[in-house]
Amino acid sequence: MSVLRAVLVQDMARALLLAAAAFILTLIVGGWWVHFARKHKLGKRIRPDGPQSHLVKVGTPTMGGVMIVSTVVVLTVLFNLVDRWSMLLPLGVMISFAVLGAIDDWLSLTGTRSKTHGFTVRFKFWIMTAVAFVASLALYLPQPYGLEHEGLVQIPFVGEVNIGLWFIPIAVLIIVFISNAVNITDGLDSLAGWNLTLSFGAYGVITFLAEPRLTNLMAFCFTVVGACAAFLWYNAYPAQVFMGDLGALSLGATLAVVALQSQQWILLPVIGIVFVVEALSTLIQTGYFKWTKWRYGEGRRVFKMAPLHHHFELLGWSQPQVTQRFVLIGTVAAMVGISLALIFGSPQSQTQVDQPAMIVQETDGVR
């Protein structure tokens, strides 16, 4: 076995072991959290204007994202905090958005803000934007102040493109949009959890094959995969616990940061197609309703209900049918995203892989 191959195998083995450890630890934490949430009546409130079939979920424990976030943070700090800058960024974003989501969940549960059932949309938006701006600066700034990505992006059929300072506002938009998109998708049992598992898994493979220098990020992705898989144990239909804003906002923002760090964020709409379509369906529904109300005096709708998974429920699909079909779409999209990343990968990364391989071959020849 060549030296390069041995290193790659070792990196993948470490990532898979972290995924397995995350799965086991999340199962343990999850069992405790479900019991704790039921005991203290941390049950979710269900929108009365949603599908009537969802009313049976009233009182189901929420804030289940804590089992994922806590596991990922602990395992990353203990076993994957080697390159501090590259790992502190996704960890910092995950924790920041988790705190915001946890407070919002708590206010919703306690009724402290009975009129809004949590933070106002505008307040959450500006907090999320502020955190996303700091993360974008950290990605753009040169070392030792940042990760020195300098606005580089890999575009299929084009190659490596430097978009300069435009990277910062684009990165902010991606982080805020994907965070909210995952939150919107988290409306059916295991729907968000499955698609997060697929998306992080896809970027784990991409960073392993297309960007070997980001092996710590690969290990981080697989840690999240293991934790999300264990969460599905409790979130499978009928769910024992919901992810809540704590999990959805934090994992969505973290997924966006991982995509940005890998320089393959242009593929995020493909890999995370379910999240993107769910969010767009809500924006289209809201925008069209407001426009028709202004234009015709009455609000009209494009879909029976937004987001899109509710539309299909009202068409007669059962919740498991909607989830399984959306997951199948997400699976194919993840495979397509990985394929595009490999076909149109970074020339720089290919050079970095080929050079060690040449060195190994020359060494073998000397022996």
Curated annotation (Swiss-Prot):
GO terms for biological process: cell division; cell wall organization; peptidoglycan biosynthetic process; regulation of cell shape. Belongs to the glycosyltransferase 4 family. MraY subfamily. Pathway: Cell wall biogenesis; peptidoglycan biosynthesis. It is an enzyme of class 2 (transferase). InterPro entries: Glycosyl_transferase_4, PNAcMuramoyl-5peptid_Trfase, PNAcMuramoyl-5peptid_Trfase_CS. PANTHER family: PHOSPHO-N-ACETYLMURAMOYL-PENTAPEPTIDE-TRANSFERASE, PHOSPHO-N-ACETYLMURAMOYL-PENTAPEPTIDE-TRANSFERASE HOMOLOG. The gene is mraY. It is a multi-pass membrane protein. It is found in: Cell membrane. Keywords: Cell cycle, Cell division, Cell membrane, Cell shape, Cell wall biogenesis/degradation, Magnesium, Membrane, Metal-binding, Peptidoglycan synthesis, Transferase, Transmembrane, Transmembrane helix. It holds the Pfam family Glycos_transf_4. The chain crosses the membrane at residues 16-36, 62-82, 87-107, 125-145, 158-178, 190-210, 214-234, 240-260, 264-284, 326-346. GO terms for cellular component: plasma membrane. This is Phospho-N-acetylmuramoyl-pentapeptide-transferase. Catalyzes the initial step of the lipid cycle reactions in the biosynthesis of the cell wall peptidoglycan: transfers peptidoglycan precursor phospho-MurNAc-pentapeptide from UDP-MurNAc-pentapeptide onto the lipid carrier undecaprenyl phosphate, yielding undecaprenyl-pyrophosphoryl-MurNAc-pentapeptide, known as lipid I. Its cofactor is Mg(2+). The keyword S-adenosyl-L-methionine does not apply. It catalyses: UDP-N-acetyl-alpha-D-muramoyl-L-alanyl-gamma-D-glutamyl-meso-2,6-diaminopimeloyl-D-alanyl-D-alanine + di-trans,octa-cis-undecaprenyl phosphate = di-trans,octa-cis-undecaprenyl diphospho-N-acetyl-alpha-D-muramoyl-L-alanyl-D-glutamyl-meso-2,6-diaminopimeloyl-D-alanyl-D-alanine + UMP.
